[in-house]
Amino acid sequence: MLKARLIRWIIWTVIVSAVVFELGENLWALLAPPPPLQISPATTWIIEPLAPDGLPDYFRAMLTLEPRAIPAESNAAAAVWELIPTTISSDNAIDHSPAHLSAADQVPASERLVMPPPPPDGMEAEEVESILETCARFPWRAADHPWLARWLDDNSLALDRLAAGARREGWCPPRCLPADRSPTDRFGPTTPLLMSLTLPVEGALRSFSNVLLARSMRRLGEGDIRGAWHDIDTLLRYGDKISDSPGSLVCRMVAMTLFARAAHATRIVILDGHLDDALLADMQRSLHSAIDWAPLAESVDTFERLSFLDAMTSMFADPTKPVSWFSLGPLRILALDPNVPLTDSNRYLAAMVDAANQLTRDARRRASQEIEDELEARKNAPRGRRQWFQPWHEVVSEGVSRKTLGLLLPGLKYSLDDDDRAHASLVLADCAAALERYRLATGQPPASLADLVPAFLSEVPLDPFTDTPIGYRIANGRWTLWSGAVPEDDAIDDLVVRGPAADSPEVPSVP
């Protein structure tokens, strides 16, 4: 009898202990404060270098991705820096060897490129900008716009230095901070350090490109064909240097802009310039070099990932922020778990890398759209019900992560479109050069682009917009090249190139 009671007592003790333990464990999970930030590939992506506060130092990690300590005489970026107005100085440049930047600060203002061109009397600034844009796209002469021709002549020394700089081999652009921001101030009052970086050289090249193209089109209009090509080749070389390494998406956008503008100008020179075979072959070599750029996926997986995770760490794990009410006492159960948004960020960034790595345009766009649709659905989804014994900080963290990523994660489709448009522009220019070389050799256009292989093209190029061979047809003795949808006979588009009419001694401009 006593033995049976002892056994029952032991059994009930075990059952009650198990129930109490399970309830206690779940109650602790419910009321426990969120864990600290975990340094791991799943959350912070990098585990070193670490800053003194123990958090990943994304800024130092970014600096290791770019070449540094390139001598000024070999650094094409230093040539651009010399021409930028002195509102930016080397004092706020982040560079391992800023000596050449300091020396560039001593260049007299008279030798720098004055931007924008001052409007003549009676002309509004908007009209000046419109005229400059037009003159950068089509041939013109000094008599057409004397004020613009004088301005280009006044800045000829600066433009010559810009063109000479593109022939340097190295590329080490400075990264600058606002004058009131120190590189040791990782968590600023408004923006994290990486998002505060400015790109003065790349930004200047974007604005300088129209000026260089305006001079190129003037040279073409006045018969200086080689001078016109020299300026266009300058932009191709700068774009090539920027895009050779997987930089930020902003830098990549600048490179694609330079490529698209230079490719359009190249087609103008080819069709208006009556070139010889040697110069056409030189154009093709430059165009081929430009097309060989670093994959977009590498940019997303390096600079964009570092920058975004730096921002998320600043938002959710900044140790310098004042302690919030949610971090005090019992309210800690409502505090945010920084690991949740960082893990979500890495998951979506990895999906963006996979999308950019897809082999066809349709697959890339479809994968990119799926990411955007999921982010939008999560952002607008109603808050889910908390499960029994689910920690409150999980609910709070999940809700904040959904809203934040939907607003801040960079869109991929715009970069994909920029890449495809620039690629198509370069391919069309290359094919136009090959067609002109074929015409010089045979006196007539080929029946198909396959006839250009292998003498003038290594293979028939694919259209980046359709993943099929680039469009080509002959009608009434005149050839047409296009990228994308088949154009109408009178369609005007940057991705449509028309050759000379069969009975025309002159070669018409690209529409």
What annotation goes with each model-predicted range?
Residues 2-511:
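Short acidic linear motifs
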